[in-house]
């Protein structure tokens, strides 16, 4: 990536300016992730920043939901034995690779996390030293909120870095 001057800068409490160099885009299997990826990638390009796409493999029961094709990703075979964590990792890796190809930028990295989505995102953001986390926020029904929690609100509550929220609807 070049070293052009970016209009995006963050000021901390001491009024010290720093340039954002790393953008972490967290996505799930929901088709609205396309909007999140596109918005996050556009933001990163404006900042001349490095990009990593992240997906977290969490409760396998959540993955029983079927979605239509988006960004070239055709979903997964419903006959997959979702109890096999190896198979879930393979499905998730394939998903991340497909989404990265959608961006047509070989410099885009991918990261697969495990466990609680918010915790995994926060942990990787800290390890990678992300300058901004990009998330989508979409409404779940009441039962989904009780079972899954709201990842975006948990990340916002516990993050040490700025969060760029992309509002999306199902």
Predicted features by range, described:
Residues 54, 109-113, 164:
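General small-molecule cofactor/ligand-binding pocket signal
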Residues 73-91:
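A short acidic, glycine-rich active-site loop
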């Amino acid at each position: 990536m070049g070293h052009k001057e970016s209009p995006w800068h963050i000021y901390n409490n001491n009024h010290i300016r720093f340039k954002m160099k790393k953008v972490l885009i967290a996505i799930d299997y929901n088709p609205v992730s396309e909007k999140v990826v596109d918005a996050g990638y556009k933001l990163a390009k404006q900042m001349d920043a490095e990009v990593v796409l992240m997906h977290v493999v969490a409760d396998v029961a959540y993955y029983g939901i079927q979605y239509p094709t988006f960004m070239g990703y055709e979903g997964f075979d419903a006959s997959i034995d979702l109890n096999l964590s190896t198979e879930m990792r393979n499905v998730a890796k394939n998903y991340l690779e497909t989404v990265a190809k959608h961006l047509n930028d070989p410099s885009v990295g991918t990261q697969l996390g495990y466990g609680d989505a918010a915790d995994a995102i926060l942990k990787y953001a800290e390890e990678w030293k992300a300058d901004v986390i990009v998330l989508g926020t979409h409404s779940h029904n009441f039962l989904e909120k009780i079972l899954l929690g709201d990842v975006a609100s948990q990340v916002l509550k516990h993050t040490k870095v700025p969060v760029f929220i992309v509002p999306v609807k199902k």
